């Protein structure tokens, strides 16, 4: 273990725990020595503080009648952070059951979106879920496993999208014969790995909100650590989604199908190294689901999130873990965009558009090429023109304009004109899905 690591493990140490002052410490973090029990209590305290609201407490009488029994959806990837959040929340429910004669302050639903094939995982989530749920008896924990293909619930929404050179986007409806795309097929049409990563985030967020709506949950919680949130701030900024930073780092509410959901990050004040230490101490790491894909060492083959993850890992290893806290505190100053006028919603990702990205891009784009000076340069120009003239374009008579945000313009840049890009387009004026269609979105405990 590096001396610069934010968590320093102590083996056979005489150092006394600075909290209880009764037993030897097992690790040092934030310049404080902790024994096992005090460190576990310290991490769990972060979640307790985040979910201190009356909604998550055991309620009686008038308060129970007014608030009712809350239902919380936990996004479980199977990674160490989501497993730690599950343990922390389930332990709270165990304490409530013990202290209140079997009563709980809220119901807990675990949701996993199956990434076994997509991420080449070392085990299926179905292998660990029964073990995980049994671990916290007598807490009654529900769990759902969704296929990523659940994202497609109305094929009539799937259209071919093309980004023009003036940054406008047009779409064309597909015939029944053409409309055979799966989610995996659509992702393969992404111009690069970062674009695929960006659109996967859109898919996951949509599936989580749909499930929360169907399951009548009021709160959605994510296991993001402080390090992960700092990572998200940088990644969103690079991907052109700066207007969404405030939603990725702070507790907030979102509207979906005319229902309001509370989004919480209970581990937002915990470093990733501390999450790993917690998992080690309570032996949660044996349940962790990991990708077997070996990340490339060549920078150009990495996604934006890979790059930002490597950046913060390097900072942790060199003694600058506090940088994550600085990034998060800076990001917290970025509230929701304040604009009186809205350009509707992006029909690809669903975010609200506050400024016309096409107009801004036209203003900053240099349209005149540098003068051609050599024969080699002229040859490249000729090849470029030939490629443009030979590429298929959508039949403009059967197309219609698409409302698209700056982040999705960045994501679609580089998509091939002959294949274009295929995606289920949303209505530009609302973030709602057709209620009749959503009613067909059936969930089971073992859906695949």
Swiss-Prot record:
A GO term for molecular function: nucleotidyltransferase activity
Pfam families listed in its UniProt record: CTU2
GO cellular component: cytosol
Keywords tagged on the record: Cytoplasm, tRNA processing
Location in or out of the cell: Cytoplasm
BP GO annotations: invasive growth in response to glucose limitation; protein urmylation; pseudohyphal growth; tRNA thio-modification; tRNA wobble position uridine thiolation; tRNA wobble uridine modification
Pathway(s) per entry: tRNA modification; 5-methoxycarbonylmethyl-2-thiouridine-tRNA biosynthesis
Family: Belongs to the CTU2/NCS2 family.
PANTHER family: CYTOPLASMIC TRNA 2-THIOLATION PROTEIN 2
Job description of the protein: Plays a central role in 2-thiolation of mcm(5)S(2)U at tRNA wobble positions of tRNA(Lys), tRNA(Glu) and tRNA(Gln). May act by forming a heterodimer with NCS6 that ligates sulfur from thiocarboxylated URM1 onto the uridine of tRNAs at wobble position. Prior mcm(5) tRNA modification by the elongator complex is required for 2-thiolation. May also be involved in protein urmylation.
Protein name: Cytoplasmic tRNA 2-thiolation protein 2
Gene encoding the protein: NCS2
